[in-house]
Amino acid sequence: MDRASENRRLAAVGKPVPGIGEMGNRRPLRDINNLVGAPPHPSAIAKKPMLEKSGKEEQKPALVVSHRPMTRNFAASLTRKEQLDHQVSVADAAVVCTDPQKNPIPDGTVDDDVESCESNDYIAVDECNDTDEDESMMDIDSADSGNPLAATEYVEELYKFYRENEEMSCVQPDYMSSQGDINEKMRAILIDWLIEVHHKFELMDETLFLTVNIVDRFLEKQVVPRKKLQLVGVTAMLLACKYEEVAVPVVEDLVLISDRAYTKGQILEMEKLILNTLQFNMSVPTPYVFMRRFLKAAQSDKQLQLLSFFILELSLVEYQMLKYRPSLLAAAAVYTAQCALTRCQQWTKTCELHSRYTGEQLLECSRMMVDFHQKAGAGKLTGVHRKYSTFKFGCAAKTEPALFLLESGAGGYNLQKQPC
């Protein structure tokens, strides 16, 4: 029934019509004082219900939104509101639990909740521990799954082959005793000079390690007079460049870098002699091959990478380091660099898995590397130290050595000895 017919019916029976004055004129419907006759306007907010006689507290009604699309922002705001309400309720419960004298609690109510909260906390800790274990055994090749050059499908088989054949690149640690005219110090001078030549020509890292390997394998099998020792080093670098580099230095450049001590013909003759002595076996695993893998397992940044290579190149100069396998030298260099940067003994399970060495197995070699690091800037053979003191190599030589590894010699290997 419309409002006009209702007014006519009331007027017919003699009842006053709401909203009509003595002159019979209706007030404007939108006048703020005319509330009686105004039509009810639909409201989006529900009215509060009346309190029941039972005395229960009135609960806060939920906000009912009409004709509101469920957008992402709106759903996120509702979720945040529910989380805040839940946090407030948990905080209130915690306050009640911590002060039982002021807030007496019936048996079997909040205590059960507290016990369940404590059990959930323990579960959360266990889950964190499981997560740490999972992260410590991470898949280091997952990021390169789409890179065909990484060869992730058979990279494990490659390094298994390298480990099985790294003995081919090793020499007897006392081969210098068979040399009558040269000694360990002369070898150190030669290697230090070759590192400077390598830096001068801006050659690849693998070229340097292959050069040193060729020198040692040749000196093990061939007696060399003192005046031809530098010739062996220059020719070994030429062979390594032909094997590793794209642009090979010309022989004339090597003649100039050696201050014309040898001719082009002498270098070519020595090249034939070295190849025949080594039976043309140039493809041997060097410490560089393993270094790349172990740095990847350690999730290295640029700083760790440069410091690891600095420590490893210091070991190339030292004759006494020939007793260690190439894989162990690379692993010990990464381990020593990590200890120097973090100031604690650090060797993750992932590094142990891919290197096949534990921290305890690396400790002896690592202590020797720390000693080399400490004395790198002193003495006459400072080529490696000057190279890694430049900005190009991150001033890695200026990093403080991990001297605490030397101090822990009596106590043995202890991962928790120095807190991180």
Swiss-Prot record:
Induction: By gibberellic acid (GA3). This is Cyclin-B2-1. One of its GO terms (molecular function) is cyclin-dependent protein serine/threonine kinase regulator activity. It comes from Oryza sativa subsp. japonica (Rice). SMART domains: CYCLIN, Cyclin_C. InterPro entries: Cyclin, Cyclin-like_dom, Cyclin-like_sf, Cyclin_A/B-like, Cyclin_C-dom, Cyclin_N, Cyclins_cyclin-box. Belongs to the cyclin family. Cyclin AB subfamily. One of its GO terms (biological process) is G1/S transition of mitotic cell cycle. Interacts with CDKB2-1. Involved in the control of the cell cycle at the G2/M (mitosis) transition. May activate CDKB2-1 kinase. PROSITE patterns: CYCLINS (PS00292). Residues 49-60 have a biased composition (Basic and acidic residues). Gene3D superfamilies: Cyclin-like (1.10.472.10). The lineage of its organism: Eukaryota, Viridiplantae, Streptophyta, Embryophyta, Tracheophyta. Pfam families: Cyclin_C, Cyclin_N. Residues 1-61 are annotated as: Disordered. The gene is CYCB2-1. Keywords: Cell cycle, Cell division, Cyclin, Mitosis. Expressed in the root apices. One of its GO terms (cellular component) is cytoplasm.
